[in-house]
């Protein structure tokens, strides 16, 4: 799947309350920043009542992303604010028909383990070539950490936080590099290209 200009598309569907989305967003921001630039990212935390709770993260809602290599379309479907009328969370963004069709087709068995896992988030669609559904690493690694602590830990490659976030970011980068023909070289390094073989 490409956009009108022929650039490959990455589509993300998640929600602000979701702790697994909270964890995945860190890796997505690291990976996507290798190909382009974000603006308007805002801090948010996952639900205080979910497990793990209160994960410090960013929201893609209200942000923009520019890249000459790919198009990134994020959809944050719900906030982290409980909605007593539904027992869920308040609606934030509604997926388009096309985005909902991707979720319905690909976020279901056999791409998830069972029917009760259908619709799992985070859901990341890499241009019709790859899927990432659910958590890529243990979100509890981020439990109790504030944004500045996580950012600081990312500068220490031996920290559990950096290993989890950057390790996942490298796999996301590898998937994107497969779609961009290994461009740019600054992102699609030899290490990343070796990861492409495992996708």
Where in the sequence are the language-model features?
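Short glycine-rich or small-residue beta-strand-to-loop segments that form or flank ligand, phosphate
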Residues: 9-15
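Conserved redox-active cysteine motifs that mediate thiol-disulfide chemistry
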Residues: 15-26
């Amino acid at each position: 799947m490409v956009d009108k200009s022929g650039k490959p598309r990455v589509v993300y569907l998640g929600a602000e309350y979701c702790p697994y989305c909270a964890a995945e967003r860190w890796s997505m921001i690291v990976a996507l920043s290798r190909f382009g630039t974000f603006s308007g990212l805002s801090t948010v935390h996952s639900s205080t009542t979910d497990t793990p709770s209160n994960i410090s993260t960013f929201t893609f809602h209200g942000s923009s992303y520019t890249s000459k290599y790919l198009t990134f379309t994020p959809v944050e479907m719900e906030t982290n604010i409980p909605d007593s009328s539904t027992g869920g969370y308040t609606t934030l963004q509604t997926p388009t028909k096309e985005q909902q069709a991707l979720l319905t087709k690909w976020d279901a068995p056999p791409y998830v383990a069972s029917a009760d896992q259908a619709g799992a988030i985070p859901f990341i669609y890499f241009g019709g070539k790859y899927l990432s559904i659910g958590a890529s690493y243990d979100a509890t690694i981020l439990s109790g950490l504030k944004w500045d602590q996580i950012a600081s830990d990312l500068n220490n490659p031996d920290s559990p936080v950096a290993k989890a976030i950057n390790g996942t970011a490298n796999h996301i980068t590898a998937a994107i590099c497969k779609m961009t023909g290994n461009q740019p070289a600054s992102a699609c390094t030899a290490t990343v290209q070796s990861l492409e073989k495992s996708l």
